[in-house]
Amino acid sequence: MDVVLDVLDTFVLDRVYASVLPGGNSTSDFDTSFFLNQHVGRYYPLQPSQWATASRWKRDDLPRQATSLLFITWLFGLAIYFIGSTIFYHTWWDKTLLKHPRFLKNQVRLEIEQALFSIPIMAILTVPFFLAEIRGWSKLYDFASEAPFPAYNWLQYPLFVAFTDSGIYWIHRAEHHPLVYRWLHKRHHKWLVPTPYASFAFNPLDGWAQSLPYHVYPMLFPLQKGAYLGLFVFVTLWTVLIHDADCLSHSAIINGPECHTLHHLYFNYNYGQFTTFWDRVGGTYRKARGDEFKIVKSQ
């Protein structure tokens, strides 16, 4: 995220902050690029903008960084949500489910409204993790040569999936405990027959809690920055995909739309995010019968 922030500061945010909170000194001294664009400078020698020091809020001021990260996370989340959900809804999602007796009146609109409410709050709650990352408190690294050992550049992907799949399973399962389910997770189970737009239609604390493993991982284990951004996009789109409510795969290993749709219908099964491993270990795995989706679509 530090590289992203350097780039956006240079091309967008420097001028915005200089306009909204003027008070610094405009500069054309590009020697300051050594101080202002250190992170992106490791990849490409990007010169700072003429407004780089023209705001009272300097680039490394905590309030400015927090504000920038909030809007980046918020807008990025909205973009991925609407692009991914719209594509899946208009391509793979079975429109016959609109007539399902458990499909709510105006459900798509209600799902979008809930997501629009939740995404900015989740962004606020996520900002501290990104602040920690850009201030050097994580184990993110820039180049493959900086990995603990060469093979780690490939191992980081399955390790990330394994760690987050485990964490999300136990967090998700805990959210179904009677003491917290009603006020934390029940809102997401309002959508018994979900559309892709239900992917972020939940209590914002619920969504944030289930995202914690993604942000904890780079605090504990090395992760290349490019891989981190790619995985961030992947997990967001995966969250949309598993709410597609269609059977794209009968895999006994992958926790795809089939497994997650059964979770929405029967509640106490298939808590996993990527695989069925922890559901099998925890005794919560439910496999679809051969005719189950025909029954679901004809009820």
Question: What are these model-derived regions, one by one?
Answer:
Residues 9, 72-84, 117-133, 159-161, ...:
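Hydrophobic alpha-helical transmembrane segments of multi-pass integral membrane proteins
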Residues 84-93, 126-134, 138, 168-176, ...:
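Membrane-water interface at transmembrane helix exits
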Residues 100, 105, 109, 124-163:
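Juxtamembrane helix-loop-helix connectors linking adjacent transmembrane helices
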Residues 67-71, 75, 116, 154-158, ...:
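Hydrophobic alpha-helical transmembrane segments
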Residues 32, 36, 60-122:
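Alpha-helical transmembrane segments in multi-pass membrane proteins
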Residues 148-169, 173, 229, 235-239:
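Membrane-embedded alpha-helical segments that form the functional core of polytopic membrane enzymes
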Residues 1-63, 67, 93-104, 175-299:
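Cytosolic/stromal cytosol-facing helical appendages immediately following the last transmembrane segment
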Residues 112, 172, 185:
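Conserved hydrophobic/aromatic pocket- or pore-lining residues that grip, position, or stack substrates
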